[in-house]
Amino acid sequence: MLDFSRIQNYYIACGYTDMRKQIDGLVAVVELQFRQKLDETSIFLFCGRRADRIKALYWDGTGYVLLYKRLAEKRFQWPRNEQELKLLTKQEFRWLMEGLSIIQKKAFEPGKPGTVC
């Protein structure tokens, strides 16, 4: 059984990824291009030009897991202007999986408690 509760780091590979790549090819992208190491606390997301499907690469402690999601309709709101790895918050990851942009203009910023007069 896959246990994603240990994931703390949600990375997306901005720009386009060749979706023909499988586990070994995506591991090479993570390690050689982005100089990152796969572990049980990180998941790496990749998206192709069509933006209707993503691949997620994860290390579960015993081997690599490759997840694939294809939308029936619509497209993912994927950052295209950068060729780097971007770290997402858990909330940004949820937004992405729900089809929203990871940059929400109307989201409330975390604040500090005020004083009552």
Residue ranges and their predicted role:
Residues 1-117:
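Polybasic/polar functional segments that serve as interface/processing modules
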